[in-house]
Amino acid sequence: MKNINPSQTAAWQALQQHFEQMKDVQISDLFAQDKERFSKFSATFNDQMLVDYSKNRISAETLEKLQALAKETDLQSAIKSMFAGEKINRTEDRAVLHVALRNRSNTPIIVDGKDVMPEVNAVLAKMKQFCDRVIGGDWKGYTGKAITDVVNIGIGGSDLGPYMATEALRPYKNHLNMHFVSNVDGTHIAETLQPLNPETTLFLVASKTFTTQETMTNAHSARDWFLSTAGDQKHVAKHFAALSTNGKAVGGFGIDTANMFEFWDWVGGRYSLWSAIGLSIALSLGFDNFEQLLSGAHAMDQHFAQTPAEKNLPVLLALIGIWYNNFFGAETEAILPYDQYMHRFAAYFQQGNMESNGKYVDRNGNPVDYQTGPIIWGEPGTNGQHAFYQLIHQGTKLVPCDFIAPAISHNPLSDHHAKLLSNFFAQTEALAFGKSLEVVEAEFAAQGKTPEEVKHVAPFKVFEGNRPTNSILLREITPFSLGSLIALYEHKIFTQGAILNIFTFDQWGVELGKQLANRILPELAGDEAVSSHDSSTNALINRFKEWR
């Protein structure tokens, strides 16, 4: 990967000049000027996913200039470097190969002179065997009963991805009940365990190092809960499995290392649901469906690696995002899935994007002079319409939005899905085209009201429009199509990081708080006042000690 400051490129200067021409252009005018706009600014992937980016404040010239930026920052070589297993995560000296985990074509991928695919396939085979035994009831607990409940204990990438995917694909779930515990707040594990039976519960402890504070605190509490009924330490082996690389610590915990599922340092946490970290997904859906999830992602990987930038969906979405973030000053992006099963999708990519591209230092080690990652947020529709859409429609912040919906519902109750999708279509139309004062006044006139009667209220009913959106319409949310959708967003994030000259695959920003927490923890043990911090932190700790 080349370390090129994007703001110093000729393409960036051209985009700044172009922005002056585009900043007041109306989306409605762009549609009026070109009856073929939709067909020119949309694409269908694999007959499964329609991506419509026509309702954006872009022209063909905008895209040409954005593509020139991708070319001048040598995006293509960055993509090749990732797929080739080069150590593009330079601050940790690691390759970045979540694409290897779902490499269904099994072509060799070399890291340090060694093909990683045999090991990837071996872990997948081990996962399949384990899943078949647990789902089929052959795996028995310490009293000889089959497993009914699975508790995944992890945090961050070891929790968000598996939880998102098992929820999104809930229509495919089998008889196993899945539970996810992440927060070190004791309430999370206590409430999760309260209705469960230790005789039929299986715990998955997901921690690469087996030292993550939150995960190991919860794992020890889960083990204590289990042993309070089971009694004998040897029974732990039948009720706990590990997703880890630390065999010594796993064995010391009481887990049989035969039930330890490994992954590698070239798998980043927030890109790890495709690895052994996805064991909870495979247990919930069955291994065949987990393989379909991998296959859907692999299909998008091939599209990303092989399609010219002009028609490459992750690249196009990434460039449009850079356009808003750096030239329009949009600080946030909303992800709005019109599907209740997808209720954790925005949270998942909140981590995926903000932990990846929330960086202020470039790949040369210098502070950047441009915007990097946006703030990501969102909720399912139509709930969001009754919460925060007011600001998106009529507020002073520009919030580009991704609207996501399936054409086919897993729950075709009455006319529910038609009503849901009518809102999905209506919102992007309303955001793009708005409603003028003339239309508002005409509507009032049609109701028989005089201009004097409506003068005081008409301005408040005006919608300026010109709010940009992407629409992603899936045929149906299946393991395959969800895999493709997740990979689309992953590669969008990679593309933005590559162009913006930052390291997307480290996360040093989480370290300082952890270090300070480790220092503060022993200070909370006694009752004596603390004075080793600033006045605010001292006062907060001391008030906590008074009140606890």
Curated annotation (Swiss-Prot):
It comes from Serratia proteamaculans (strain 568). It is found in: Cytoplasm. One of its GO terms (cellular component) is cytosol. This is Glucose-6-phosphate isomerase. Keywords: Cytoplasm, Gluconeogenesis, Glycolysis, Isomerase. The active site is at E355, H386, K514. InterPro entries: G6P_Isomerase (IPR001672), G6P_Isomerase_C (IPR023096), Phosphoglucose_isomerase_CS (IPR018189), SIS_dom_sf (IPR046348), SIS_PGI_1 (IPR035476), SIS_PGI_2 (IPR035482). GO terms for biological process: gluconeogenesis; glucose 6-phosphate metabolic process; glycolytic process. Pfam families: PGI. Gene3D superfamilies: 1.10.1390.10, Glucose-6-phosphate isomerase like protein, domain 1 (3.40.50.10490). Its EC number is 5.3.1.9. Pathway: Carbohydrate biosynthesis; gluconeogenesis; Carbohydrate degradation; glycolysis; D-glyceraldehyde 3-phosphate and glycerone phosphate from D-glucose: step 2/4. Belongs to the GPI family. Catalyzes the reversible isomerization of glucose-6-phosphate to fructose-6-phosphate. Its main location: cytoplasm. It catalyses: alpha-D-glucose 6-phosphate = beta-D-fructose 6-phosphate.
